[in-house]
Amino acid sequence: MEKNKLDQLKSMTTIVIDTGDIEAIKEYSPTDATTNPSLILSAVEKPAYKPLMEEAYHYSQKAKSSGEQISLFLDKLFVNVGCEILKLIPGRVSTEVDARLSFDVEGSIQKAQSLIALYKEMGIEKERILIKLASTWEGGLAAKQLEKMGIHCNMTLLFSMPQAIHCAEAQATLISPFVGRILDWYKKHDNVPGYAPAEDPGVKSVTTIYHYFKKFSYKTQIMGASFRNKEEILELAGCDLLTISPHFLQELHDASGNVEQKLDAAKSKQLNIEPIKMNEKAFRLALNDDAMATEKLSEGIRNFAKDAQKLEKMLRTTYKIG
């Protein structure tokens, strides 16, 4: 019997589910899972999450002020959802540091440590957790210190090579370049309805980063994220990991035909690529020169921060905090 495209893809790439929805995770048997404030916000509106919220609320009452309580409530809720997900997958779950700490090295480190401590209280070791940090200069510095502590990092909101190199030099466990959001920007900028899959700017960006990392033997893994169609996903077959929403997992599951491996570390090693020197000045200048990466990074931080605030507001209203 012919394998569907999802099963074929699983043989060449680690498949990660991009959701906070526990029912969807049960359905697709991924290795890992990623969450973010936006996904948690949509998930907690479902009745199944009520006990996780109730438990987080009671836990947060040990905090001294209403500000500390809401912060602890949010962290505990993220960890509770993460623990439920970990019951269903063999691998790791990614839990995000508050996007409002994207330019705060110490704040990011402290938040990561407190999330890891909450997981430990639940009997989950840090090896099964990836801490998500925005791929700012400061995010990379925080990741460098966290990785030295044995806390593994997933660098998110990544749109450019300078961000990728900075994160790899920080020895982050993995990066999550956002394929679909790059496509969105170029479609609007170039005023076109779309691109052929191989010419998709998001696909080309991840492919270039993949070649660079494999050429120079960086240990940091690449997890393509934020897809707009299944063709983008198939163009990155062979990437270390791909994090895919339930909708596209279903499309791939229902699709037949041969999946060709597009990315191969051994082939990337043979390419003639010049190394790029990266320090803070070079990073900031290169990011500033890249209008797409600058705009998408800023927008991503704003949107994740906005959803964290919405979640806080919902919890404050529901539980009458402060």
Curated annotation (Swiss-Prot):
Query: What is one term from the GO cellular component aspect held by the record?
Result: cytoplasm
Report the EC number(s), separated by commas if there are several: 2.2.1.2
The record's disulfide annotation reads none
Keyword Cytoplasm in the entry? The reply is yes
Look up the domain of life of the source: Bacteria
Q: What EC class does the entry list?
A: transferase
> GO biological process annotations for this chain's record?
carbohydrate metabolic process; pentose-phosphate shunt
Write out the catalysed reaction. D-sedoheptulose 7-phosphate + D-glyceraldehyde 3-phosphate = D-erythrose 4-phosphate + beta-D-fructose 6-phosphate
Active site at 132 (schiff-base intermediate with substrate)
Q: Name one GO molecular function term.
A: transaldolase activity
Q: Does the keyword Transferase apply?
A: yes
- Give the UniProt keywords, A-Z: Cytoplasm, Pentose shunt, Schiff base, Transferase
Check the record and name the InterPro entries matching this protein. Aldolase_TIM, TAL/FSA, Transaldolase_1, Transaldolase_AS
Q: Pathway listed for it?
A: Carbohydrate degradation; pentose phosphate pathway; D-glyceraldehyde 3-phosphate and beta-D-fructose 6-phosphate from D-ribose 5-phosphate and D-xylulose 5-phosphate (non-oxidative stage): step 2/3
Q: Extract the signal peptide range.
A: none
Q: What is its main location?
A: cytoplasm
Where is it located? Cytoplasm
- Note the subunit structure: Homodimer.
Family as reported in the entry's similarity comment: Belongs to the transaldolase family. Type 1 subfamily.
What does the function comment of this entry state? Transaldolase is important for the balance of metabolites in the pentose-phosphate pathway.
Protein name stated in the entry:
Transaldolase
Q: Gene behind this chain?
A: tal
